[in-house]
Curated annotation (Swiss-Prot):
InterPro entries: AA/pep_transptr_DtpD, Dipep/tripep_permease, MFS_dom, MFS_trans_sf, MFS_Transporters, POT_fam, PTR2_symporter_CS. One of its GO terms (molecular function) is dipeptide transmembrane transporter activity. The keyword Ribosomal protein does not apply. It comes from the Bacteria. GO terms for biological process: dipeptide transmembrane transport; protein transport. It holds the Pfam family PTR2. This is Dipeptide permease D. The chain crosses the membrane at residues 14-34, 49-69, 91-111, 138-158, 167-187, 212-232, 235-255, 267-287, 312-332, 344-364, 379-399, 413-433, 458-478. It is a multi-pass membrane protein. Probable proton-dependent permease that transports dipeptides. The gene is dtpD.
Length: 493
């Protein structure tokens, strides 16, 4: 077998850890909005607010996590520490059923763990390849698709355990999954000796009376407590504003650090891709909030007398990602000709177009509910599957481009900024969108019909919004195609 055509052996341990991280994160996420509304009896407004705050802050911390990995911990140690914290957070969340005061603390611990894990798992994968290695795009697609095995199994397993036993057991299962992934990853340590490790010189250096490892321990204790206060006082939006401002300052600093026109061009491409990713995920993240409650209330979930738990529907788009991702990874590996920038914009246009198509199907489903009281399950499954397929043309493409940039020591921070915009801000926008479906704004006389009409309106607006994004991206694609062909003709002449 051609060694250049096969993936590095270390990728399989990264993929295994990603699978279990997806299991842990998405198992908990599938339960959270339902836990808030059905168990803790939050109204829709309050539940959407806390859910979007959690999903926003979970993407703010990767900036700090990326910085710590770049300067002190290295990607491998940051990933392991993040996985451990997430497991602890899920266990504490299970206790919040008995003591609701643990709710904010548990979410804060998960947020901190996710910050260390999420941006650095992609950077760790990037360390396995040379910058121009043609296997790189295929590796990222494989990571993204295989990781979704966890996303498929988690809502089914955690949803079933919650339904049959308790909410606490459902969250505990998510924690067990994360610990299992960490153990598997540790078994493959020998394959990562060439990756960047802990910077012991920086870690042991003294700053303001304490060595840096002492400040790191203080940070690991103080950060969850601070984030707990943000949840409790509902101040997360202010943290988001501050984080965004810091991210923009850091981005400007990186731009000044770029020494060549090629580096600045690559950085500009990353920024533009990030903005479109932000809009894409503002639409896609309805899956964990408004779409989940829509399914719970207005979709017929009965199969031969068995009512399918709402959480299990979170598996549908993940299954679509896994099913189509392997094929896409093969196509990317084989199709390496042509201009890379043109291919990138073509993929983004396809991803946004599929998202628009998915919400068009959900709009039809909501209209069916408005007319007949409940919508059919197959129509809902089809819409979620199309939306899942769309994801393959957004994140893997953008992350591959970020790890490709030829500016030393910035990939972790750039990944964190990408997570901030396409994750934190996108989730905040998703919360604003989802709040338009909240029942608390409806009067009692026509609550049910009015609620369904709100879902129809929101899903339809997202359909047109995503389609408008497709139009803009296609214009960029046409411009890049024309420029590439003009250069090719100039070279031939």
């Amino acid at each position: 077998m051609n060694k250049q055509a096969s993936q590095p052996r270390a990728i399989y341990y990264v993929v295994a850890l990603q699978i279990w991280e997806y299991f842990s994160f998405y198992g908990m996420r599938a339960l959270l909005i339902l836990y808030l509304t059905n168990q803790l009896k939050y109204d829709d407004n309050h539940a959407y607010e806390l859910f979007s705050a959690y999903c926003s802050l979970v993407y703010v911390t990767p900036i700090l996590g990326g910085y710590l990995a770049d300067k002190v911990l290295g990607n491998r140690m940051a990933v392991m520490l993040g996985a451990f914290l997430m497991a602890i957070g899920h266990l504490v969340l299970g206790a919040s059923e008995i003591a609701p005061t643990f709710l904010y603390l548990s979410l804060a611990i998960i947020v901190c763990g996710y910050g260390l894990f999420k941006s650095n798992i992609s950077c760790l994968l990037g360390e396995l390849y040379q910058p121009e290695d043609p296997r790189r795009d295929g590796g990222f697609s494989l990571l993204y698709a295989a990781g979704n095995i966890g996303s498929i199994v988690a809502p089914i397993a955690c949803g079933y355990v919650q339904e049959e036993y308790s909410w606490a057991m459902g969250f505990a299962l998510a924690a067990i999954g994360m610990l299992a992934g960490l153990v598997i990853f540790l078994c493959g340590n020998r394959h990562f000796t060439h990756t960047t490790g802990v910077n012991k010189a920086v870690l042991c250096a003294r700053n303001y009376l304490l060595p840096n490892w002492g400040w790191l321990l203080i940070l690991l204790v103080a950060a969850p407590l601070l984030i707990t206060v943000l949840f409790w006082k509902e101040w997360s939006v202010y943290a988001l504003i501050v984080a965004t401002a810091i991210g923009l300052v850091v981005l400007a600093k990186i731009y000044r650090q770029a020494q060549t026109a090629k580096q600045r061009k690559e950085l500009g491409l990353i920024v533009t891709l990030t903005l479109f990713s932000m809009l894409f995920w503002a639409f896609a993240q309805q899956g964990g909030s408004s779409i989940s409650l829509y399914i719970d209330r207005f979709v017929n979930r009965d199969i031969l007398g068995y009512s399918v738990p709402t959480a299990m529907f979170q598996s549908v788009n993940a299954f679509a990602v896994m099913l189509c991702g392997v094929v896409l990874a093969w196509l990317v590996k084989e199709s390496v000709s042509g201009n890379r920038t043109v291919r990138i914009w073509g993929k983004f246009a396809l991803g946004l177009g599929l998202m628009s198509a998915g919400f068009c199907i959900l709009t039809l489903s909501a209209r069916w509910s408005a007319a007949y009281g409940h919508s059919s399950m197959p129509l809902m499954v089809l819409g979620l599957a199309v939306m899942g397929f769309a994801e393959l043309f957004i994140d893997p493409v953008a992350m591959s481009q970020i790890t490709r940039i030829d500016i030393p020591g910035v990939t972790g921070v750039l990944t964190g900024i990408y997570m901030l915009l396409s994750g934190a801000i996108a989730n905040y926008l998703a919360g604003v969108i989802a709040d338009q479906t909240s029942q608390s704004a409806f009067d009692a006389s026509g609550a049910v019909n009015y609620a369904i009409n709100a879902y129809v309106d929101v899903f339809e607006q997202i359909t047109w919004g995503a389609l408008a994004c497709v139009g803009v991206v296609l214009l960029i694609w046409l411009y890049q195609s024309f420029k590439f062909k003009s250069r090719a003709l100039a070279v031939e002449s």
